[in-house]
Amino acid sequence: MSRIGIFCFFIIASMGAPFAVAADMLVDDVPIPADARVEVPLEVSETLSRFSGAWVGSWGDRLHHILIVEDISASGEAHVVYAVGNNGVKGVWRRLEATVSGNALTIDDTFNATYVLTPADSLRATYRRGDAVGQATLSRIALTELMLPGAHVAWATPSEFLDTRLQEGGKPIRLEVVIKKPSGSGPFPLLVFNHGSTGRGTDSNLFTATYASPQIADFFVEKGWIVAFPQRRGRGKSDGLYDEGFAPDRAQGYSCDSGRSLPGADRALDDIKEAVDALRQRSDVAAGRILIGGISRGGVLAIAYAGMHPEQVLGVLNFVGGWMGEGCSTAAEINGALFQRGGKFGRPTLWLYGQHDRYYSIEHSRSNFDVFKKAGGNGEFFEYAVPGGIGHALLAYPNLWSGDVERYLTVIGALRAQ
């Protein structure tokens, strides 16, 4: 079962019984109870009252989700309707109890779902079970809109497409990109944040999932940045073949052979160059150097890209970066070769890693950092104890890394005067 499939199984199974399986009302593919209601909260704080109402979004870009906060007390006790659908599972809803503390609503029971209010009046949701971590950003919607017959919802931010100079089979390639930005016309400073791999590369169903990080988007948009999440060739809705270092038999997934793996990284770097060049031409993007970052494979690509194109880059955010996991005996060779390319960047970079990462141990990642510094690289390395011992999920915990990122932005002069 794929990681997305496992995650969806967990999030449905954890709802337990009893739950509704017959849709009282259907919003696209998500059932909600016909008697859903929202009671106007009385004599509660402004923060508590902001949770009240209906919210819509998607777990992992695939599992549609509706949360209805039906009532909330002055002490933070709430009753919610939790509903999901899509991704090949039968839509379900259930009424659950929840608790609000500060700006976070946590569903009680054993559900492991938390919703954090953002300054943009959205909910940043995180679901955790074992090493499965799901993320979603939920937008507010009037319950009356959901209750209309035949109601439909815009579940995710619409994608845009970048024209590139890439071609395959004589046909031009367009790359999908998710854009998050502040209100207004800008221009805004640009962060390009790059996605990782698909686990072992053996499940083609994962190739078409569009990646965007609500944590990164919320953090930077609040600070006045436009954030772009480009999808490389064959990923998400981008054109072309996903071909980042596969074995000769693609069913075997990513190859540990450096002769196949490193050309795959070069292909990914070509895609990033095309995306960056196209994004810098936008009227809402400020002239000048950009920030570049990424998670996992996207992290090492960001470091390498900065070394290859230092004239474009102001700073680099590397979250748990690496190209091949330590399950490959060639991991040190492959990862070291890519991080070494970043040494020519010269400016400060930020390396953020979680302890007990099942792909990249702290020892391995610090060794990569040493290789980078010996090649002339400049940076700081931080490690964090991620809850549950799932270090590769560090990005889902902005409470751990946001302070270090803000300090880094101050150091490189990337924070605009407030």
Q: What feature does the model see in each segment?
A:
Residues 24-146:
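Central antiparallel beta-sheet cores of small beta-barrel/beta-sandwich binding domains
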Residues 245-282:
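Alpha/beta-hydrolase active-site loop
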Residues 315, 321-377:
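The feature captures the conserved acid-bearing segment of alpha/beta-hydrolase catalytic domains
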Residues 375-418:
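C-terminal catalytic histidine-bearing segment of alpha/beta-hydrolase fold enzymes
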